Amino acid sequence: MTAEEIQGIINEELKAEPDIENVFGLDLTQRLIVPTKQKYWDSADKKSFEYLWTVLEETPDKNGYVIYFDEETKMFGLGVQTNDELFDIGNYGTFLKTLYSM
């Protein structure tokens, strides 16, 4: 899967939102990033990890939540960054369901 394909999935979902500058309190024109594959540690089993596509960073300083896309399950999920490492904290399904779960 490519970054462009993932962006297409997100853009299709965002058609349902009347104002992408204020979706659940976030300006998505500022918080969405070019999908980037990154290493995520399993928050329950800190010995295992997988590579997932980061698509949104809640804060510019990377201290908040992130939203990722899992190309194997075709689902979006939440992660957090601590000590310069990303941790997967769960899949929520669609991009918007994940965003509303933050």
Q: Regions from the language model: what does each represent?
A:
Residues 29-73:
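Amphipathic, interaction-prone secondary-structure segments
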Residues 21-22, 57, 94:
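General structural signal for secondary-structure boundaries
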Residues 71-102:
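A short, surface-exposed interaction/processing loop segment used at functional sites
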Residues 1-46:
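N-terminal domain-onset segments
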